């Protein structure tokens, strides 16, 4: 990149950052936000690969309930959409509060995205939600590059 172009882009980036509370601002509205929220994250449980996945998920749910987190999120590589995994999914459902799913790169090893959405009860591969004055955005980063296209 040429020096002049770099300096121009740097200046534009700095100008964008100085515009407060506009569409370009990504800070939460702290006047609406609760003082503190807590949530539990679990990732790479790999039900279909790890023999102790049920036990590990049970411990996660127990700890989330014990710590009284506001909600839980599983960050992908959870379980395939197969009848044998209904018991595992039922463990997840024992958490009494809000819970969210995110597709992982291995979740579609045996199933389509559509099958995973149906099995987990996800609204879409990407979605957003508000909690405690904060806005959370879940994105789908799982796109395969095949035949020169995504």
Regions picked out by a protein language model, each given a short descriptive name:
Residues 22-87:
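N-terminal active-site segment of His-dependent metallophosphoesterases
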Residues 11, 74, 102:
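Short glycine/serine/threonine-biased micro-segments
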Residues 12, 66, 94-97:
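Secondary-structure boundary motif
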Residues 17-18, 59, 92:
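A short hydrophobic/aromatic micro-motif that marks alpha-helical segments and, especially, helix-coil
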Residues 2-3, 112:
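Helix N-cap and loop-to-helix transition residues
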Residues 11, 46, 79, 106-107, ...:
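Short, glycine/serine-rich, charged loops/turns that create anion-binding
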Residues 3-27:
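N-terminal export signals
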Residues 83-150:
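Extended active-site neighborhood of metal-dependent phosphoesterases/phosphodiesterases
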């Amino acid at each position: 990149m040429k020096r002049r172009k770099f300096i121009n882009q740097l200046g534009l980036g700095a100008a964008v950052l100085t515009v407060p509370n506009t569409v370009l601002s990504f800070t939460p509205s702290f006047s609406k936000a609760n003082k503190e929220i807590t949530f539990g994250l679990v990732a790479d449980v790999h039900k279909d690969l790890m023999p102790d996945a049920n036990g590990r998920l049970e411990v996660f749910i127990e700890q989330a309930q014990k710590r009284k987190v506001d909600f839980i999120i599983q960050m992908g590589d959870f379980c395939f959409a197969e009848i044998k995994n209904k018991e595992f999914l039922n463990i997840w459902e024992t958490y009494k509060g809000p819970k969210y799913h995110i597709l992982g790169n291995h979740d579609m090893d045996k199933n389509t995205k559509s099958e995973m959405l149906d099995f987990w009860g996800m609204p879409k591969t990407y979605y957003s939600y508000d909690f405690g004055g904060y806005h959370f955005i879940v994105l789908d980063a799982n796109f395969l590059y095949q035949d020169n296209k995504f």
